[in-house]
Amino acid sequence: PVTVVAEEKGADLKQRIARNFGCPQPEGYRKSLRLMQQAEKFGRPIVCLVDTQGAFCGMEAEERGQGNAIADNLVAMASLTVPVVCIVLGEGGSGGALALAMGNRVAMQDHAVYSVLSPEGFASILWKDRTRAAEAAAVMKMSAREACDMGIIEEVVSEGDGPAHENPEQAAAYVEEFVTRSLRELYRLSPEELRDQRYERFRAF
């Protein structure tokens, strides 16, 4: 048995509205925390599928403790003694992504991005000019290859022949291979080694 925690945006407008465009509320992070604590209790490995532009940042989310919910996830994931494998599918934005990406192995799909905010937001803050988004993206180094080169992730996972949304079954097969292989490798470590390896991994950057 494996515990799977996933952020989902939806495939069309109706689904995206129902899923809050993939921006989790505090309750979503608390639900994921309960699942991870349950996995720890029963010794189940955890697989996190990350796809979000970031945690929902509305006033109501802040009033319900969005920052605390993200911080609680990070603290809990740092102390888990079961294998944790994470993969960014499409987009990993800010703390909303990091709250489910503190794993022993972290990967990104080939066309995915991982950053603290959008290039448009970066450009508007740094240069007061959203039209410089392409320049901002280059500075931010948010692509999968760049994240791998910097040691933020271990692996870039192929999406097959073209982007994942055009051939989801092929892309899913590559994700399955990465997750399965990573879990096999991590099962060789003791619970204490898993926790320590995860801590050292994130302290490195």
Model segments located where?
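Glycine-rich beta-alpha loop segments
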Residues: 1-49, 67-72
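Intrinsically disordered, low-complexity segments enriched in small/flexible residues
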Residues: 1-2, 6-9, 21, 165, ...
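Conserved catalytic cores of soluble enzyme domains
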Residues: 44, 50-180, 184, 188
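Aromatic side chains
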Residues: 21, 29, 42, 56, ...
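Generic intrinsically disordered, low-complexity segments enriched for polar/acidic and small residues
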Residues: 18, 53, 111, 196-199
